[in-house]
Amino acid sequence: MMTYIVFILSIVFVMSFVGFATKPSPIYGGLVLIISGGIGCAIVLNFGGSFLGLMVFLIYLGGMLVVFGYTTAMATEQYPEVWVSNKAVLAAFITGLLSELLTACYILKDDEVEVVLKFNGMGDWVIYDTGDSGFFSEEAMGIAALYSYGTWLVVVTGWSLLIGVLVIMEVTRGN
């Protein structure tokens, strides 16, 4: 049952990308990205990553809501275009949805969904002793590994976000 839930969430995840690729107005693009981010968090939660799913949901979607609220206020239209207002956009949207649904039907024709990716490297991390408590959280160990082994990744990510914010502020500043 859980495999089918992840499969359905994955279908909706890809359909949201189709909706983003054929967005007629920036308002709908932001909305579809927020929906796809929430569905991605649900997929992570379904695989047991409760802390990671919650953090992505709070930080990523919270930041996106602020950014898209700001950009919507800056570039709002009185009558925004919708998917049915332009025939080419509607045709691209329907073609994308049909191709995704046909792919899903092809996968489900055998009456069984199987995991395509095998996670062979799951035991590669060194596990530290937890002491007398006996409690071990994989997510806490992953975050510890990110900050200990991936220090440069965290630094580069922080600088990239800072540069991105400065560029966006400069572009939207105007004359």
UniProtKB/Swiss-Prot annotation:
The gene is MT-ND6. Keywords: Electron transport, Membrane, Mitochondrion, Mitochondrion inner membrane, NAD, Respiratory chain, Translocase, Transmembrane, Transmembrane helix, Transport, Ubiquinone. It is found in: Mitochondrion inner membrane. It is an enzyme of class 7 (translocase). Core subunit of respiratory chain NADH dehydrogenase (Complex I) which is composed of 45 different subunits. Core subunit of the mitochondrial membrane respiratory chain NADH dehydrogenase (Complex I) which catalyzes electron transfer from NADH through the respiratory chain, using ubiquinone as an electron acceptor. Essential for the catalytic activity and assembly of complex I. It is a multi-pass membrane protein. This is NADH-ubiquinone oxidoreductase chain 6. The chain crosses the membrane at residues 1-21, 25-45, 47-67, 88-108, 149-169. It comes from Canis lupus familiaris (Dog). Coiled coil: none annotated.
